[in-house]
């Protein structure tokens, strides 16, 4: 909550500063609105979770393959995915399609750990699985902008994203691990849709755009395997809440 409050205060400060500059009478922004092509960079804060689809028999204990009639785990009570933080760094490639429409491509490197909580009938056997990811992302979006009011615009954005997980195979190699120590793994290639709302603030030599975005994967990211943490799962979809600062 404290971090969210700090973000809101920061956003308000930027807004106040921008409108103060409007009073100075400058049509600022470094001429970015007059360019067909506008480069830049972005910093992103993400909060991510899995949308979990479970198998019909997800609650049953996982059997011990070496000892018939015995089980490696207790009966499951719930499987959930809490929000977990991450961050990203990227570049902006913007193309002006019209006075109120842009095409924006933002190649980004994202570092993110997602979590899955397993609660068993015995509360002491609670287990949390961490799924570490490092992804190269290629979002493509159409930006629909309001008319510029001196040094301010609002906009909506919609588009799609291709993500490729580049985390080292060595970090996810659990071939020599016991079944109760195995990892839940993601597919390497992920497709997502995105929607966002943002604001363009024009300073003397650049444009700053804070943006709030929701992103959901289209395909299941689960790589199915036979062990106690993957077997109860049918599908996993990613859901990201993202706050970004774009500089152009």
Feature roles, as predicted:
Residues 34, 98-100, 147-151, 202-204, ...:
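Outer-membrane beta-barrel channels and translocator barrels
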Residues 26-28, 185-195, 199-248:
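Predominantly the C-terminal beta-signal and adjacent terminal strand-loop region
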Residues 21-85, 248:
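Short glycine/proline- and aromatic-enriched beta-strand/turn motifs that initiate or cap beta-hairpins
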């Amino acid at each position: 909550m404290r971090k969210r409050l700090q973000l809101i205060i920061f956003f308000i400060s930027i807004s106040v500063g921008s409108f103060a500059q409007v009073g100075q009478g400058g049509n600022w922004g470094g001429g970015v609105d007059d360019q067909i092509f506008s480069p830049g960079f972005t910093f992103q804060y993400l909060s991510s979770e899995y949308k979990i689809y479970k198998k019909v028999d997800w609650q049953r204990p996982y059997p011990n393959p070496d000892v018939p009639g015995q089980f490696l785990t207790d009966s499951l009570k719930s499987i959930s995915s809490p929000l977990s933080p991450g961050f990203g760094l990227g570049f902006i490639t913007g193309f002006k399609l019209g006075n109120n429409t842009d095409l924006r491509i933002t190649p980004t490197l994202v570092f993110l750990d997602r979590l899955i909580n397993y609660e068993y009938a015995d509360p002491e056997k609670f287990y949390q699985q961490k799924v570490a990811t490092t992804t190269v992302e290629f979002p493509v979006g159409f930006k629909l902008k309001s008319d510029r009011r001196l040094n301010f615009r609002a906009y909506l954005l919609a588009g799609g994203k291709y993500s490729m997980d580049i985390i080292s195979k060595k970090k996810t190699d659990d071939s020599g691990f016991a079944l109760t120590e195995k990892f839940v793994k993601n597919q390497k290639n992920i497709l997502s849709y995105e929607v966002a709302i943002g604001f363009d603030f024009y300073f003397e030599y650049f444009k700053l755009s804070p943006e709030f975005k929701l992103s959901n994967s289209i395909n299941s990211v689960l790589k199915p395997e036979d062990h106690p943490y993957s077997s109860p799962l049918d599908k996993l979809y990613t859901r990201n809440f993202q706050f970004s600062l774009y500089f152009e």
